[in-house]
Every structure is written in C-alpha cells, then in structure tokens.
C-alpha cells in the first residue's frame, strides 16, 4: 500500500485551502469539508479567525451552522497556502489582485488557483483572469467557479448547482471531483473561461436594477423585463469579448441572474430596493452591512462596455443613479422612453 507523503504544517493531507472567510468563503469551506475532506479556511483578521475556531461556527454570517470536524481554521497565510496544491480564492473583487500578490510568495511549484470572486478589476474593468495572469504569470493553472449560490443555503446543505471553467481540463475534472457532492452540490464543467467570469459581474448590476424597480413599486412585469433585457446586455458584452453564447444560458449566466434578481438574500437586490424606496447610495450600502459587489461592478461593467463599444442601456442608467446622482424613477422612465428596437438588438 502506497502512503501519501504529507509535507505541511498540519500533518495530514489537505484537499483544498479556501482564501477568504466571509459568508461565501466559509460556506464553501463547510461544503467542501462536509464529506470528511480536510479543508483549510484562511481569513486575514486573526481575531475573527480565533472566534471562528472558538465557536466552530461563523455566527455572524451563517448562524446555526457548525463547522465539520475536518475544517481547519487558519490565520497564517503561508501555512494555509502551502498546505494544499489547490487554492479557492473567495474575496471581494476590489481586493482580488491584492490578495493574489499577498499569497504569491508562498505558492508551491504545483499550486493551482481557482476563484469564486464575482466582479471585474476596479478602475479598469478587466476580467479577473487578466489580473491573475499579470500577478502570477502563466506558470499556474487557473479556474473560475460561478453560478447561482446563496451562502446560507449552501452551508445548510440545500441542493445547489454551479459551474467551473479553466483552460486546464484536468484542473476542471479535479475540481469537479473535490467540490461535487451527489446529495446536495452539483458541479458542471464549462470550457468558457471568459464568459463564466463576465456573467457573475453583469448579473450583480442587473440585480440592483431589479431591486430598484421593485422598490419603486413597478411590479413583476417590469422586473421580468429587466431580467430578460439584462440577459441580452450580458450576451452582447460577452460576444464582444469572445465568450460562448451558451454560457449565458447556463448556471453562471441566466441561473445566477434569476437568483440574484428575485430573492432578497441578494445584497445587490436589497441595495437596489433601498435606492428605489428613496434612500441615497451611502445609506443604502450602510444598511446592508456587507460588501455590495454590484456597486463597484456597475462602474467596472460600464467602463468595459464603453471600451468595447457595446450598448448596455440598463447598465448605463444604473451607473447614472449610482455615480451621477440620477433619480431611480427617472432612470426607469428614460429606459422606457428609448427609441423602438427589435428584440434581437
């Protein structure tokens, strides 16, 4: 019998290290370790991580859900990164590049990096894969995990489906094997590395619009129209970037869009609701109490659309509300007042 050589600080084989101990990172770590696999969860605040270890739970974000025995809580980045070949980065998009720079010195020669971050690079609107290549070079295999997932439901073991994409087919297969749980968590393989990243950013913006519409009181018809036309905008931008159209009909496109636009577990939707009810941007964000990815994503997607010459009227109106002080009701009226168009355009 061949014994696996273990060379890490924990003295046992680590299936995966999750970088980021917010609600989503913690829920993924719980799900990954639920079947007995050893998983390291790293967070950058030692006091927060000490509390997670003492409680063996994340009471702030995931109340009532205990950590499996095989989930290891860690605040030492070097130990966490070197513990496993495979890293899953789950941090807000505006610190994605910073976190990659922080972990880079500790990477192993065989490290592979996947991220579940949804968004684009701040101030540039670049895809996160381009940020990762800039920071890490082309030596390491990269992948993206995306789809319709709320952290509380995932952590509670409720049925969930998601997709993973990478230029490295073996990395995709290995991630499917590690993440997939036949009873509660289904993972689909996808070959569209670009489209998978874009869907997660654009849907955040459209969800703010859907929330604004509902906050104003426009009803189900308007919400559905926003979702449908928002999907069209997502597809147009994806086509300009070379993404595969079918990706946007899958988990990382339509699936995530519908989830985020229709359920109040979505911070982006709740943020939009508050704006539609008359609150200003700062108050609406403060009321959420956690990062609202769609706020920054709106500027990033708007910048990307401008650079690519892609018309995205919903994104444009939401950008004007968030960054130029436009009234949400006026933005909705201006959308309806646009020149007549064919549905396919």
From Swiss-Prot:
Its main location: cytoplasm. PANTHER family: GLYCEROL-3-PHOSPHATE DEHYDROGENASE, GLYCEROL-3-PHOSPHATE DEHYDROGENASE [NAD(+)] 2, CHLOROPLASTIC. GO terms for biological process: carbohydrate metabolic process; glycerol-3-phosphate biosynthetic process; glycerol-3-phosphate catabolic process; glycerophospholipid biosynthetic process. The gene is gpsA. Sn-glycerol 3-phosphate binds at residues 118, 147, 149, 203, 256, 266-268. InterPro entries: 6-PGluconate_DH-like_C_sf, 6PGD_dom2, G3P_DH_NAD-dep, G3P_DH_NAD-dep_C, G3P_DH_NAD-dep_N, NAD(P)-bd_dom_sf. It catalyses: sn-glycerol 3-phosphate + NAD(+) = dihydroxyacetone phosphate + NADH + H(+); sn-glycerol 3-phosphate + NADP(+) = dihydroxyacetone phosphate + NADPH + H(+). The active site is at residue 203. This is Glycerol-3-phosphate dehydrogenase [NAD(P)+]. Belongs to the NAD-dependent glycerol-3-phosphate dehydrogenase family. Disulfide bonds: none annotated. It comes from Vibrio vulnificus (strain YJ016). Keywords: Cytoplasm, Lipid biosynthesis, Lipid metabolism, NAD, NADP, Nucleotide-binding, Oxidoreductase, Phospholipid biosynthesis, Phospholipid metabolism. One of its GO terms (molecular function) is glycerol-3-phosphate dehydrogenase [NAD(P)+] activity. One of its GO terms (cellular component) is cytosol. The keyword Phosphoprotein does not apply. It is found in: Cytoplasm. It holds the Pfam family NAD_Gly3P_dh_N. Its EC number is 1.1.1.94. Pathway: Membrane lipid metabolism; glycerophospholipid metabolism. NADPH binds at residues 23-24, 44, 118, 151, 267, 291, 293. Catalyzes the reduction of the glycolytic intermediate dihydroxyacetone phosphate (DHAP) to sn-glycerol 3-phosphate (G3P), the key precursor for phospholipid synthesis. The keyword NADP applies.
């Amino acid at each position: 019998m061949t014994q696996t050589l273990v060379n890490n600080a924990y003295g046992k084989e680590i299936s995966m290290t999750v970088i980021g101990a917010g609600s989503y990172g913690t829920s993924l770590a719980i799900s990954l370790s639920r079947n007995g696999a050893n998983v390291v969860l790293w967070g950058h605040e030692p006091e927060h991580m000490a509390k997670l270890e003492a409680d063996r739970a994340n009471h702030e974000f995931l109340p009532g859900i205990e950590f499996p025995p095989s989930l290891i809580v860690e605040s030492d980045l070097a130990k966490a990164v070197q513990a496993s070949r495979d890293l899953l980065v789950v941090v807000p998009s505006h610190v994605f590049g910073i976190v990659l720079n922080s972990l880079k010195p500790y990477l192993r020669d065989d490290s592979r990096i996947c991220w579940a971050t949804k968004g684009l690079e701040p101030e540039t609107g670049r895809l996160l894969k381009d940020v990762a290549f800039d920071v890490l070079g082309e030596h390491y295999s990269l992948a993206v995990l995306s789809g319709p997932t709320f952290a509380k439901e995932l952590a509670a073991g409720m049925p969930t489906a998601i997709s993973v994409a990478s230029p490295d087919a073996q990395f995709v297969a290995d991630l499917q094997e590690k993440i997939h749980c036949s009873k509660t968590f289904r993972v689909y393989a996808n070959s569209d590395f670009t489209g998978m990243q874009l869907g997660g950013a654009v849907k955040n913006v459209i969800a703010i619009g859907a929330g604004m519409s509902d906050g104003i009181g426009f009803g189900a018809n308007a919400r559905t129209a926003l979702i449908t036309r928002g999907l069209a905008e997502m597809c147009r931008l994806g086509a300009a970037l070379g993404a595969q159209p079918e990706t946007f009909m899958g988990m990382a496109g339509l699936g995530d869009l519908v989830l985020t636009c229709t359920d109040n577990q979505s911070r982006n939707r709740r943020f939009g609701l508050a704006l539609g009810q008359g609150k200003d941007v700062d108050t609406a964000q403060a009321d959420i109490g956690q990062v609202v990815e769609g706020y920054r994503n709106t500027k990033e997607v708007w910048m990307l659309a401008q650079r690519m010459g892609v018309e995205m009227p919903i994104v444009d109106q939401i950008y004007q509300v968030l960054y130029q002080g436009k009234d949400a009701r006026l933005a909705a009226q201006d959308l309806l007042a646009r020149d007549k168009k064919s549905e396919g355009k």
